Structures are given as structure tokens and as C-alpha cells.
Amino acid sequence: MIKVAKAVVLITCLGAILAVTVPASASQAMHRNRTIRIGSCQISGRFATCEASGSVNNPIRIKVHVKAVPNQRFSGNWSMVCSKRNGAASSSGTVSGLTPRVKELRMPFASPDSCDVAAIASLNGRGSLHVYLTARVP
């Protein structure tokens, strides 16, 4: 009877350890990707304009962030050139709206080896403008 009770306690403890360990290791595998800032600019004034640019290796996704104080309308555009193996391709587009604004940029192909990115934005009035680029990487 005592051996059965010890076995039940041992199995219960082992189950509790596995219940904590397995989700933790699965969680670590899911969170290996991280977001990094690859370019930034800040400026103040009437119709303030600034350009953020940068390079990134193995991006999963790239975003442009536009913030202003006070919040207001803005317009801008972005472009990128990415390489993969022996080839290269580009993509570009516009970004506009009301700050704060975050826009995911369309990469020219999936899983590029590297990308060079630039984004420019201009305020429609007076204020402080902050434009920055982020990338999700492995």
C-alpha cells in the first residue's frame, strides 16, 4: 500500500514538472523572433519632413511607424530593395493618414536574405515628427 502511494505521489510530481517544463520550452521556441529598430528620424517645424532608412538581414516583416505631436495628418512614401540568393527586387508604396500610424511594408518576395529600406513622411501642419522602421527577425 505504501509503495502504491509513493508511486502515485511520484507520478503526480512528474506530471507537474512536465506541465511546467513543456509549455516553457514551447514558449521559448515561439518567441525566438524579435523586433529591432533599423532606422529613425525626428524633426520639428511647419510641414516637417524626415526620412528614416536602414538595412536588415533575414527580415520576416518590416513596418514603418509615423508619430507626431500634436497628432495630425501626414503623407509619405517608402521603398525597399531586397536580395535573395543571386537575385534582387524592389517594392515601394505610399503611407498616409492620421498619426500615430503603423504600416506593414510589402516585401518584394518572401524570406529575403537582406533588405535596404527607406521611408519619408511630411506633416500637413506644424509639429514634431518621428518616423522609424522596425523589422521582425529570427
Could you describe each region identified by the protein language model?
Residues 27-138:
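Post-signal peptide N-terminal regions of Sec-secreted extracellular proteins
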Residues 1-27:
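Secretory targeting and sorting signals
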